């Protein structure tokens, strides 16, 4: 940017870091017209009408263009030689003739060369080999009046340079932009790096960096592949001699191979420190037999390690620390699991027996490594573990074998320190990825459970196999049909969907069947092999279309908001028809195993009715949102009926009103799918769903796979058909039926309808093969069948809990549910042990708490002012509960900054203030000020604080902030005094 135009928005700062030279079109015009006074911009603009001049000036100052190098002196004014459309056609054709990198330009989307099915374009009366296969609307933007006028000002040469070398970004409302030319920015790997502190590159530094060696991968982005230890069910004896190549350990070449394996970077081999996303093992290709000088001291230690590993019996150590337990049918499955401390003791014993003490440097470093290993084993299912975290507390100067030569006491220079750190980091990376993880994979079945949420559970593989056998046998008989090998080969050749792999999730005394449809398979096709795309990847177009059909039915209201909108509408209707004062009857039911009981033939008939339109268009675009410290990308796939498709230019205008600091990048070339194609893919997925169990393959006869990307959409259609078939009376005046997946809450002022709904659910829905769970059925009235839940059939209980909130049985006010800091909440949390743990912690707390906080909770047209205030209080209380659960998990690992509470209050204040503005209007007087919102939230956090966290550094500012806000808003309003008086009861 030039000095007189400093970018202020976050998205512009992000763009500035992606290009060597970023400027507005106005700056580019001034650059082109330098030294051309006769054709200056001011002289040309004087001939325009005032309104056109204003519009054109805004266009020049708001449109941004980025270059990989600063435009050279040769970019000067030249009179236009052709029209704008002809110039664009020539630029696109030139891109097809250039390198592959240039071919990814957005302007080329929708064009092809020498296509037989399309008529070629003509430029200046001469046939061009360029043909249009799909309308690229970005071209029409560049052919608009403003761009034609710009061509007259800067000329053909400068316009050609701008279109071919630059990336152009059109300004949208609220500091948003649309990319209309250049290589799509979502292809850049910049989204995990910070964007506000990156130094702006000059042309000279850019050239120097391009000539430098392969760039170092950040240790924060090098993660230990912990996900690979989960769900390894195959029971094979671990052949350590074969895995570690120990048969000829006395051979010098074997030890040399170990050195290459552990320290690949020192031998010039491909490694995780220089190649991102190194998913597979790279074969050792170094032919050099010379050991690098830096590894001469570790050579005898590695040789000693290999010999010890050859002598040790891993099975004996395993049976000692993780003994076999006899299984019994009456006990819970989790009672047979191993404690993480047992697994840790097993691995610690191996490390002590296999590795020499000198390889760790000293006992202090070894204890740090053991502590990190214990943390690694106790992490939950979705928690990550980076190399930066592992290396953060290790003192490199204390490791003797890293010293080059005999000068152990000499002062280290920076380059020597970095080299030592690099070598030991390679060893730590190998220790986890190639030593510890293979042992865990071989001896344990590792999973999460339904009861313990995300907590990692360890089983002996032989015990796991015995526990699973009865359940798998019954599932084979009830839901699956075995197919012979000949049919398998025929089906594999016909289908585009690979077979699915199942896994079992422990659930009290039984299991839940989970189907993995994200896995890719390598199959034999005659003499060749073919890698199949995963089932979920193939079915994404179908998922987009089913989502579109659901949005059409619900008028575009998201799933998570539909329940609240129905409740709001129901209350308004009761008030309108003067039925609000009548007693309200509540029935809550839960469908048993709904996914496993869906009838496939009925499902096909339902979906076929929904696919009314003959053809659908699927549009895909990317959004890049810039925050103060990073940029995140997201891919969106949307489906439309062919005749209802809205141009993307209008779509981004609407999206820009709801967001800020976002860049939109369209894929341009859309997909089209006919209804018959969609139905065929769906039928192939369900009726031809092949599941691999052991070495055999089975066909699923009943239900739909829970791991499918389509499951939630198909379940929605199936449930809606059930409602139309059995529960149409719930749509009468004075009644409402709320549904979240397989949970129903029926509210009515008619007791007969409530009893009818209850009796129907108790009998079951035979046509749809559904029955209800009696222990989860809740009512608030007496019933002749005697099915009464004593907990809720009580006059003192005035609220009905449902899906993260509770409904007042008289006023229908809604209160946000408050989680308790118990084992379930602790097990549901996950932390990322990376460099930016503080930011990750802050955003996790924010997202997890605000995700369930809908506008209805502070809508005073639905809730009373007191209950709206209570919901803000409960938000603070629940956020404090979650924060303490996270801090409990991060104990002795990380302490967030002391300004955590201040930052949280500021963000929450803005978020809730915005929600109030959306409900009551920005011009209306809101019933709470920003300071009062923060005070309520702070009061909730204070009351949610447990004694053990009262003096935690993270909450030091809490009491101070609460007192400051109390002094600021005095005297308190009556509603706030009421909250303060009853605050101890509000969270119950």
Swiss-Prot record:
Its EC number is 2.7.7.49. InterPro entries: DNA/RNA_pol_sf, RT_dom, Telomerase_RBD, Telomerase_RT, TERT_TEN. Belongs to the reverse transcriptase family. Telomerase subfamily. Pfam families: RVT_1 (PF00078), Telomerase_RBD (PF12009), TEN_TERT (PF11474). Keywords: Chromosome, DNA-binding, Magnesium, Metal-binding, Nucleotidyltransferase, Nucleus, RNA-directed DNA polymerase, Telomere, Transferase. This is Telomerase reverse transcriptase. Mg(2+) binds at residues 590, 742-743. It comes from Schizosaccharomyces pombe (strain 972 / ATCC 24843) (Fission yeast). Signal peptide: none annotated. Its main location: nucleus.
């Amino acid at each position: 940017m030039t000095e007189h135009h400093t970018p202020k928005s976050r998205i512009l700062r992000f763009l500035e870091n992606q290009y060597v030279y970023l400027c507005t079109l106005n700056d580019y015009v001034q650059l082109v017209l330098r030294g051309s006074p006769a054709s200056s911009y001011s002289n040309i603009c004087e001939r325009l009408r005032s309104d056109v001049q204003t519009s054109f000036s805004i266009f020049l100052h708001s449109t941004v263009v980025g270059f990989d190098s600063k435009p050279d002196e040769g970019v000067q004014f030249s009179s236009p030689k052709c029209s704008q459309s002809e110039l664009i056609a020539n630029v696109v054709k030139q891109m097809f003739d250039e390198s592959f990198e240039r071919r990814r330009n957005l302007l080329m989307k929708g064009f092809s060369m020498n296509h037989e099915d399309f008529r070629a374009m003509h430029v200046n009366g001469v046939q061009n080999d360029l043909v249009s296969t799909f309308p690229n609307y970005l071209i029409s933007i560049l052919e608009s009046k403003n761009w034609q006028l710009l061509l007259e000002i800067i000329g053909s040469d400068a316009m050609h340079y701008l279109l071919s070398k630059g990336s152009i970004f059109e300004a949208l409302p609220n500091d948003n932009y649309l990319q209309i030319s250049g290589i799509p920015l979502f292809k850049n790997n910049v989204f995990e790096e910070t964007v506000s502190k990156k130094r702006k590159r000059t042309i000279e530094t850019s050239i120097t960096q391009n000539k430098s060696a392969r760039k170092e991968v950040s240790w924060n982005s090098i993660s230990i592949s912990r996900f690979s230890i989960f769900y390894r069910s195959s029971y094979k004896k671990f052949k350590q001699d074969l895995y570690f190549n120990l048969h000829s350990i006395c051979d010098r070449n074997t030890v040399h191979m170990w050195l290459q394996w552990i320290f690949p970077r020192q031998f010039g081999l491909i490694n995780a420190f220089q190649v991102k996303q190194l998913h597979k093992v790279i074969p050792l290709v170094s032919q050099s037999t010379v050991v690098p000088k830096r590894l001469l001291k570790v050579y005898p230690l590695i040789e000693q390690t290999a010999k010890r590993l050859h002598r040790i019996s891993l099975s004996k150590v395993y049976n000692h620390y993780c003994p076999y337990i006899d299984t019994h049918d009456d006990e819970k499955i989790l009672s047979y699991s191993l404690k993480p401390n047992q697994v840790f003791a097993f691995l610690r014993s191996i490390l002590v027996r296999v590795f020499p003490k000198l390889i760790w440097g000293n006992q202090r470093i070894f204890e740090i490594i053991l502590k990190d290993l214990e943390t690694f084993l106790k992490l939950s299912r979705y928690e990550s573990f980076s190399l930066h975290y592992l290396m953060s507390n290790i003192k490199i100067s204390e490791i003797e074998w890293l010293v080059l030569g005999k000068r152990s006491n000499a002062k280290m220079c920076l380059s020597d320190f970095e080299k030592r750190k690099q070598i030991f980091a390679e060893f730590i990376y190998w220790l986890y990825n190639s030593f510890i993880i293979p042992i865990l994979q071989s001896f344990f079945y590792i999973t999460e459970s339904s009861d313990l949420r995300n907590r990692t559970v360890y089983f002996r593989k032989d015990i796991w196999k015995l526990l699973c056998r009865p359940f798998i046998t019954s599932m084979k008989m009830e839901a699956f049909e075995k197919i012979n090998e000949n049919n398998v080969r025929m089906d594999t050749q016909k289908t585009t969907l690979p077979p699915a792999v199942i896994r079992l999730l422990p659930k009290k005394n039984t299991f839940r069947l989970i189907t993995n449809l994200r896995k890719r398979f390598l199959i034999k096709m005659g003499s060749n092999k073919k890698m199949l795309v995963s089932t979920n990847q193939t079915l994404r177009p179908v998922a987009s279309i089913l989502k579109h059909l659901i949005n059409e039915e619900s008028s575009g209201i998201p799933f998570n908001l539909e329940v609240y909108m129905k409740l709001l509408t129901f209350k308004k209707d009761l008030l309108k028809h003067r039925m609000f004062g009548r007693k309200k009857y509540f029935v809550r039911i839960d469908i048993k195993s709904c996914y496993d009981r869906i009838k496939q033939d009925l499902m096909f008939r339902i979906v076929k009715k929904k696919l009314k339109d003959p053809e659908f268009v699927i549009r895909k675009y990317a959004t890049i949102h810039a925050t103060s410290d990073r940029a995140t990308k997201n891919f969106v796939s949307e489906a439309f009926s062919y005749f209802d498709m809205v141009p993307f230019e209008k779509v981004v205008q609407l999206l820009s009103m709801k967001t800020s600091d976002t860049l939109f990048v369209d894929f341009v070339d859309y997909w089209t799918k006919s209804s018959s194609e969609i139905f065929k893919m769906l039928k192939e997925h369900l009726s031809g769903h092949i599941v691999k169990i052991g070495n055999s393959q089975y066909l699923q006869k009943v239900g739909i796979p829970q791991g499918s990307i389509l499951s939630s959409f198909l379940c929605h259609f199936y449930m809606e058909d059930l409602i139309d078939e059995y529960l149409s009376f719930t749509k009468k005046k004075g009644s409402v039926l709320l549904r979240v997946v397989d949970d129903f809450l029926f509210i009515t002022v008619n007791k007969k309808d409530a009893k009818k709904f209850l009796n129907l659910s108790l009998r079951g829905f035979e046509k749809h093969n559904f029955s209800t769970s009696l222990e989860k059925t809740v009512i608030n009235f007496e019933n002749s069948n005697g099915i009464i839940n004593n907990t809720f059939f009580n006059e003192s209980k005035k609220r009905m809990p449902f899906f993260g909130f509770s409904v007042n049985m008289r006023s229908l006010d809604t209160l946000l549910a408050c989680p308790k800091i118990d084992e379930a909440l602790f097990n549901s949390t996950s932390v990322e042990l990376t460099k930016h743990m503080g930011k990750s912690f802050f955003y996790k707390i924010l997202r997890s708490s605000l995700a369930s906080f809908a506008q209805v909770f502070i809508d005073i047209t639905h809730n009373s002012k007191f209950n709206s205030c209570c919901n803000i209080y409960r938000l603070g209380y629940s956020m404090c509960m979650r924060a303490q659960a996270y801090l409990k998990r991060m104990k002795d690992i990380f302490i967030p900054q002391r300004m955590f509470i201040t930052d949280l209050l500021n963000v929450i204040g803005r978020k809730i203030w915005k929600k109030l503005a959306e409900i009551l209007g920005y011009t209306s007087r809101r019933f709470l000020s920003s300071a009062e919102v923060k005070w309520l939230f702070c009061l909730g956090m204070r009351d949610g604080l447990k004694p053990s966290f009262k003096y935690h550094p993270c909450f030091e500012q809490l009491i101070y902030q609460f007192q400051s806000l109390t002094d600021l808003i005095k005297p308190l309003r009556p509603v706030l005094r009421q909250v303060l008086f009853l605050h101890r009861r509000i969270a119950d």
